[in-house]
């Protein structure tokens, strides 16, 4: 976000703030992130796109720029969010994927993880899975789907919902990994949700 604001401020010669559809925790990479910004004057979208991609770092790319109504807000208008968490299960760590997946280095009981995940789908108070103990706002969220896919050397957990708390996906994933390691019972998710304390969930 800071890099985008820096380049836009340089282009417009004004202090610019953007609103993203969602924040990303440390170590999280955004794909197809939507952001909105109010500019004082009318700019050609193609000119903005070209300028930003010319001056942004190589690991950030703006795919498209479109004019929207004055009322549009990327975060408030977001219909849903999707997180994909990759877990490496092969013994040897991949040097090419080290920034994009968590290396566990062991096989997991995926069927047990899927059973546990079913109890997390729906509208619940996810306070147990919130990384911010001082959270004052509601910790109720809706997860519409959790898909767990297994390939030869990787497990991918895809969470879809209306929004996620700070570190919620990491904590959910850490908990499901413990289920896959048989360190936690697959049927324990309802009890965990009722606990309302972070210390009872998995490590991250």
Label for each model-derived stretch:
Residues 1-204:
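Structured-RNA-binding interfaces characteristic of tRNA pseudouridine synthases
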